[in-house]
Amino acid sequence: MIQFIDVSKTYDNGVQALKNINLTINEGEFVAIIGLSGAGKSTLLRAINKMHPITSGQLLVDDVDVGPLKGKPLRLLRRSIGMIFQSFNLVKRMSVFNNVLTGRVAYHSTFKTFFGLFPKEDKIIALEALDTMGILEKAFTRADQLSGGQQQRVALARSLAQKPKIILADEPVASLDPITTVQVMNDFTKVNRDFGMTIVANMHHVDLALKYATRIIGIRDGNLVFDGPSTEVDDDTLVKIYGRSLAHNEILGVEE
């Protein structure tokens, strides 16, 4: 469970990215955060694993107060939270298999992982994660030889190998073509359904958010302006979140 209690975030330049946010995300939910660029979506997402520390309020993950965490307790929190980025964050010159193995780094000493001394169990976990994502045959291919969609699947496999309870996805399909986007979103649905992992994703394309997420969080100018089931989102709701009708490039317009 993730709880925001009167959470605010002000950056050093004075920009108030989050304003008194109160919300609870339950275990196993698939939540999409939507809103204009600069609304505070990424700040909200990255506050959960303290990539962007909050300024005030309280943020709890499984009843642990994230705010004071540092050192080993913070590393343990981040071990339980997978992170997917728009840019994939793979080591391009490494094999797919070794990239996925890095999901196990937090379970071992720096010395062992620096020299690639992963136990057999970790290697099995990495291969199983690749199999789950349907790219086991690419295990020993260099990451930079894969398509964008395949690279994002490797990133998701890396998160699976981490054995997290929560996966945070920051615009995970923004750099993909429409067809590949649908394939990757289906992968997120599979992870959520088959493993019961909580998925919290920032989404640029509203129709994708409504199709795949069961719950929508709308952020506007740092404020929480909507929180409810995706089935309850209508045109009036979107105007409330975006302040206007949606532009064409915010609608993906691709059917599965």
PLM feature segments, named:
Residues 178-180:
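Helix N-cap at the start of a conserved alpha-helix in ABC-type nucleotide-binding domains
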Residues 167-170:
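Catalytic Walker B motif of ABC-type/P-loop ATPase nucleotide-binding domains
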Residues 142-146, 150:
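Conserved ABC ATPase signature
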Residues 163:
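Conserved catalytic motifs of ABC-family nucleotide-binding domains
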Residues 49:
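Helix-to-loop junction immediately C-terminal to a conserved catalytic motif
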Residues 64-65, 108, 112-137:
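Conserved ABC ATPase "signature" region
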